[in-house]
């Protein structure tokens, strides 16, 4: 029985030895990911030596309690090694952020616990690969952050340069505006100055165009320039131009008026004297005879001829070149005939008949004469009445009396008695009797 117990004791440490080896490997792998790269070969050699020692201990039939104490010692040694490696890593990567340090220390402890729970060699290899990947990703992030910081510095420097250029351009604009204000006071003096100013403005606009394109690169759009003063300057220039044009037009009109006066004087001289003689006198004096002067001389000759024939002269307010003097004289004659008073002469027979017409009633006679516009001449009418006219007047009186009687009868039938039928009644017979 004693021999069998010893054999079991010998077998037990042999069975437990592979478990120990796995735990040792896991504990060695639980070192921080940055240290695992550099100390991978050393950990392997140590694990092999520990395997050999554990085999020797199994052969010597050590007890389980002994093996437990050995495990505790080994775990203490490993923990001290871990602390050293972590301190070393902290010194190497002191430039990293505080968040990464905390994450690395916490990840180390979590990994140590997980590895003690799990017992598989393949998983440890995958974890080491993941650590390497994380390490690479962190290095990439550092590079990216450095490049970003450089870009930010560059963008800041660019923005400063743009601000400086803007301030310079604003100062230039202010200078230009101040110059333009001082110039605008003396714009109305000369036209040449306004032309030179407009040319200089065009040049400035051409110079400022490429600057606007360079400003468009900035993120914030620049505000539009204030153009109120420019419009005012343009309005002043337009007023000055209008004034100049008005002055020119006035000068031209004055010249035309002077020429017309000269022509009228020449025409008057031609009218008073012979036109041929005046033209000859002008030629003799040496003055140039223009076609206008010749036309004025001809018109003056026509006016003199019309005056001699009709005795009517064309007034001076008419244009002698546009008015025919003979036609003007005929029109004046007609006007005089129309508007002159009537001469006292013999009246026609028809006028006398209408004047002496008698309706048998004085009121009717007065009304008729007023309507016809005949003046009352009773005394003259009574004295100058002939026998023939007297007969005609009597006949007219009878006719008018008969008409009045018939009118009264018709009125009584239609309005008062209201006769029936077509009118062939006793009333009509009574009319015939009357």
From Swiss-Prot:
The keyword Chaperone does not apply. Belongs to the RSRC2 family. One of its GO terms (molecular function) is RNA binding. Residues 35-51, 112-214 have a biased composition (Basic residues). The modification Phosphothreonine is found at residues 6, 16. There is a cross-link at residue 375 (Glycyl lysine isopeptide (Lys-Gly) (interchain with G-Cter in SUMO2)). Keywords: Acetylation, Coiled coil, Isopeptide bond, Phosphoprotein, Ubl conjugation. The modification Phosphoserine is found at residues 4, 17, 30, 32, 104, 376. InterPro entries: SMAP_dom. Residues 1-230 are annotated as: Disordered. The modification N-acetylalanine is found at residue 2. This is Arginine/serine-rich coiled-coil protein 2. It holds the Pfam family SMAP. Residues 1-27, 66-111 have a biased composition (Basic and acidic residues). PANTHER family: ARGININE_SERINE-RICH COILED-COIL PROTEIN 2 (PTHR22426:SF2). The keyword Iron-sulfur does not apply. There is a cross-link at residue 375 (Glycyl lysine isopeptide (Lys-Gly) (interchain with G-Cter in SUMO1)). Residues 230-270 form a coiled coil.
């Amino acid at each position: 029985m004693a021999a069998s117990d010893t054999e079991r004791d010998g077998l037990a440490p042999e069975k437990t030895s592979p478990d120990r080896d796995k735990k040792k490997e896991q504990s060695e792998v639980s070192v921080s990911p940055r240290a695992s790269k550099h100390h991978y070969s050393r950990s392997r050699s140590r694990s092999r030596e520990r395997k050999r020692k554990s085999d020797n201990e199994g052969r010597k039939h050590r007890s389980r309690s002994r093996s437990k104490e050995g495990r505790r010692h080994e775990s203490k040694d490993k923990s001290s090694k871990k602390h050293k490696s972590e301190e070393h890593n902290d010194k190497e990567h002191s430039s990293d952020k505080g968040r990464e340090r905390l994450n690395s220390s916490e990840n180390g402890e979590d990994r140590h616990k997980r590895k003690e729970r799990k017992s598989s060699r393949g998983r440890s290899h995958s974890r080491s690969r993941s650590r390497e990947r994380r390490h690479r990703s962190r290095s990439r992030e550092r590079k990216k952050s450095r490049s970003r910081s450089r870009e930010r510095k560059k963008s800041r420097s660019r923005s400063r340069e743009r601000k400086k250029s803007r301030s310079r351009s604003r100062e230039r604009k202010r200078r230009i505006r101040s110059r333009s204000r001082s110039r605008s006071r003396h714009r109305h003096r000369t036209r040449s100055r306004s032309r030179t100013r407009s040319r200089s403005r065009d040049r400035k606009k051409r110079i400022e165009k490429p600057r606007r394109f360079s400003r468009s690169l900035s993120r914030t759009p620049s505000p539009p320039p204030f153009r109120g003063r420019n419009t005012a300057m343009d309005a002043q220039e337009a007023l000055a131009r209008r004034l100049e044009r008005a002055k020119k037009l006035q000068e031209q009109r004055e010249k035309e008026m002077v020429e017309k006066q000269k022509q009228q004087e020449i025409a008057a001289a031609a009218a008073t004297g012979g036109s041929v003689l005046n033209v000859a006198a002008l030629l003799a004096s040496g003055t140039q005879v223009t076609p206008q002067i010749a036309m004025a001389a001809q018109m003056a000759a026509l006016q003199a001829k019309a005056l001699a024939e009709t005795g009517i002269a064309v007034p001076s307010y008419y244009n002698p070149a546009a008015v025919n003097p003979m036609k003007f004289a005929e029109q004046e004659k007609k006007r005089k005939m129309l508007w002159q008073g009537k001469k006292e002469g013999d009246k026609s027979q028809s006028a006398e008949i209408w004047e002496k017409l008698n309706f048998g009633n004085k009121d009717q006679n007065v009304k008729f004469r007023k309507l016809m516009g005949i003046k009352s001449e009773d005394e003259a009418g009574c004295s100058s009445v002939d026998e023939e006219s007297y007969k005609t007047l009597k006949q007219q009186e009878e006719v008018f009396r008969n008409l009045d009687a018939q009118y009264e009868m018709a009125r009584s039938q239609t309005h008062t008695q209201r006769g029936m039928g077509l009118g062939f009644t006793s009333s009509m017979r009574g009319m015939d009797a009357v």
